[in-house]
Amino acid sequence: TKGIDAAIQIVGVDTAEGRRDEALRLGLADAAYAAIGEAVAAEHPDAALVCTAPLAHAAVIGELLDNDLPVFTELNLVSDGYRENMAKAAAKKLPLFLSSTMLYRRETQYIKQQVAEFGKPVHYIYHIGQYLPDWHPWENYKNFFVGNARTGGVREIFGTDLPCLLDAFGDVESVTVQKDTL
């Protein structure tokens, strides 16, 4: 927790006592609480990072904004609460930033630069797929967000990649899909 700046304190919130204990034991957090309100009252944080199950994002972001905290959130896989939370952040003049890390990576910027320098239309074939038991072997994929029809189905990868693809190549003109099951 101190790799960037020794003065930074990281406080975790998780309803699962075992996860809170593990975060403290591994030195991933300086303190851990069962509820956002409890953490805010005790620690008075400067900002919040949302790194939780996608279907919980809207409520968590809303509660953090209600506590007057700037929010950085990992990719949200559903649009639940987007408009409300954006309006709340704007009304409170609080930053609400959705992760777009891939847009800033060097390799992504390199691809964008090469496409621009080429100066002609380009053809790009995008292939994505994953075998969930291999991707996340430490727990059954049916027990976390990729096992849910609203938040699974490679959304977490495609949702991260799509802004980069659009930034480098422009608007999509056509789509072809091939699907198979093993």
PLM regions and their residue ranges:
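Predominantly a Rossmann-like dinucleotide-binding segment in NAD(P)-dependent oxidoreductases
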Residues: M102-Q178
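Short, conserved SAM-binding/catalytic segment
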Residues: E22-D30, N85-A90
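Short, Asp-centered acidic motifs that coordinate Mg2+ and/or phosphate
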Residues: D46-A47, H123
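Conserved acidic residues
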Residues: I10, D30, D46
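N-terminal Rossmann-like dinucleotide-binding module
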Residues: T1-L26
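Glycine-rich phosphate-binding loop signature in dinucleotide/nucleotide-binding domains
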Residues: A41-P45, E117-F118
